[in-house]
Amino acid sequence: LMPNGEVTTIYEASLKYKESRTPLIVLAGTEYGTGSSRDWAAKGTLLLGVKAVVAASFERIHRSNLVGMGVLPLQFEDGETHRSLGLSGEEEYSVFGLSDNLKPGQDLILSTGDREISVTCRLDTQIEIEYFKNGGILHTVLRNFMSENLKK
């Protein structure tokens, strides 16, 4: 569903949002990412233009794969879900608290404009923070490679 009420496919919607440079967010339930093709699920998420996933909980490997793709995993406080908070997905979201001093597991604010919701940043290690800041593992490796070669 597009903001104007037009019903379309997820893929078509993602293309329109990408064209308008609108980053996307996914609202999810428990154990987000459980399933067999998890690495491709994270790649597909990124390719659709999703910049963050906010879930009640994450499947461990999938959370790591999201980070590896540069997608920010955010977790609702215990017992909270997007449904219990009355979030429909039609809201416009902002994430506050991301900074150069980001710490593993830091609390952030998910804002809908009229509401502020506390979420936990599920970048669980300092290296995951670096991956996220660089746009994922591949970008981190390329930056390190380029940095080393420029020193020579």
Q: Over which residues does each language-model region extend?
A:
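Fe-S-dependent hydro-lyases/dehydratases of central metabolism
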Residues: L1-K152
